[in-house]
């Protein structure tokens, strides 16, 4: 099997192996605030008696126990396995933090999100992305490639990136 991007293949295979997922997938991306926004969203859904789980910097919550994680955005096998578990437990809302590394490394490929949230963008991770443009493009993968048709994008209209986000 010849493939230019084995990480993308791994994500697609994971999505096919672990087909069952919660009904509503929500992703949060941005330089700062991913964890806070994911946690706020989690608490709002939980307070409204929705079954919800959250994946990110704080680990995986919403299962019987909180599982710790080493990356903000898990590897595709762990994502698939955990989403499959949540669906079996009838948890139908999952919030995932989508880091620029995770997006650029295709860890979320094969998933389709109902809601995408963009918090902000500032100069960070340029050791990995090299330019601010590359960093922004990594964040935009969520909105360009991983959203369901008719999905919801949430972002600050006053951000200088609002025009770009509106035109996706």
Residue ranges and their predicted role:
Residues 1-29, 36-53:
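Short, basic phosphate-binding NTP loop
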Residues 13, 28, 55, 79, ...:
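Residue-level signal for inorganic ion chemistry
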Residues 101-109:
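Conserved helix/coil segment N-terminal to the catalytic DExD/H
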Residues 66-76, 124-129:
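Flexible beta-alpha connector loops of hexameric P-loop NTPases
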Residues 49-64, 99:
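Short beta-strand-centered segment that lines the nucleotide-binding/catalytic pocket of NTP-utilizing
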Residues 1, 88-92, 104, 113-168:
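Acidic, Mg2+-coordinating active-site environments of NTP-dependent enzymes
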Residues 38-42, 83, 166:
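A generic structural signal for short, well-ordered alpha-helical segments in conserved domains
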Residues 71-99:
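Conserved nucleotide-sensing/catalytic segment adjacent to the nucleotide-binding pocket
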């Amino acid at each position: 099997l010849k493939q230019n991007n084995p990480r993308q293949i791994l994500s697609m295979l994971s999505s096919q192996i672990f087909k069952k997922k919660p009904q509503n997938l929500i992703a949060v991306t941005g330089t700062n605030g991913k964890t806070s926004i994911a946690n706020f969203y989690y608490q709002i859904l939980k307070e409204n008696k929705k079954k919800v789980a959250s994946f990110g910097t704080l680990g995986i919550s919403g299962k019987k126990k909180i599982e710790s994680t080493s990356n903000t955005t898990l590897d595709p096998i762990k994502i698939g396995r955990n989403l499959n578990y949540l669906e079996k437990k009838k948890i139908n809302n999952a919030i995932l933090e989508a880091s620029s590394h995770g997006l650029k490394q295709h860890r979320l490929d094969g998933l389709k999100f109902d809601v995408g949230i963009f918090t902000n963008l500032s100069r960070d991770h340029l050791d990995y992305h090299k330019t601010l443009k590359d960093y922004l493009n990594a964040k935009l993968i969520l909105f360009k490639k991983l959203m369901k048709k008719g999905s919801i994008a949430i972002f600050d209209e006053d951000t200088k990136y609002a025009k770009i986000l509106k035109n996706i």
